[in-house]
Amino acid sequence: MSDEFSLADALPENSPAKTSAVSNTKPGQPPQGWPGSNPWNNPSAPPAVPSGLPPSATPSPVPFGPTPTGMYPSVPPTGPPPGPPAPFPPSGPSCPPPGGPYPGPGPTGPYPTPNMPFPELPRPYGAPTDPAAAGPLGPWGSMSSGPWAPGMGGQYPTPNMPYPSPGPYPAPPPPQAPGAAPPVPWGTVPPGAWGPPAPYPAPAGSYPTPGLYPTPNNPFQVPSGPSGAPPMPGGPHSYH
């Protein structure tokens, strides 16, 4: 007798729950109706080949070339990648020169006369307008060696106002005493009293004359004593 127990052994022979679909299988085995896609449970199935590189190819950690050999095979090699170097860009301008005839040089020959005079250069004050009218120059530039004439070699123009004459001037007015009104040389003072033309009118209505007002009745009268004022509480008392 086998040690294995199944549901078919516990049911009677004519039980409706016991059908031919129930099989005596082990807990670790799939049912008979499942496809045998697992190569471990189906020894007759061919082994599944993983997708990707073929078994003979060795994966390389670098994106180019064979697997490096040496002390550190996992470190990618340094330096430029193998193969011919990339071509350098051509030297010169980025765009070709324009073709066709080039424009010629500008017009040559006598230029037209300008239609406006040249601006005059700034001159020092007092210098003559015509340069030919200037006096002879000395060894020190603009300083003339001869006597100076009016308008020669001067830096400032001749004044257009004569200097004041040194003639007699009117005497200054005498000093005024402090507090006295200065004389008024212009106009005259009107005669009569100064002030408003008429006195101010008296205020309308009668106002009470200020004086002594009656004292209101005080309900709290202090009785007069022999000394005139009552003794203060806590103060000294006189004993008779």
UniProtKB/Swiss-Prot annotation:
Q: Does the record bear Acetylation in its keywords? A: yes
Keywords from the UniProt entry: Acetylation, Phosphoprotein
* Ranges of Low complexity composition bias in the record: 34-43
Chain intervals with Pro residues compositional bias:
44-66, 74-122, 159-185, 193-202
Q: Where is this region: Disordered?
A: 1-240
Alphabetical list of Pfam families matching this protein: MISS (PF15822)
Q: Which domain of life is it from?
A: Eukaryota
Where N-acetylserine occurs along the chain?
Answer: S2
Keyword Cell membrane on entry: no
**What segments bear the compositional bias annotation Polar residues?**
16-26
Phosphoserine: residues bearing it: S2, S6, S15
Tell me the protein family, please: Belongs to the MISS family.
Q: Which PANTHER family match?
A: MAPK-INTERACTING AND SPINDLE-STABILIZING PROTEIN-LIKE
Q: What name does this protein carry?
A: MAPK-interacting and spindle-stabilizing protein-like
What lineage, starting at the top, does this entry show? Eukaryota, Metazoa, Chordata, Craniata, Vertebrata
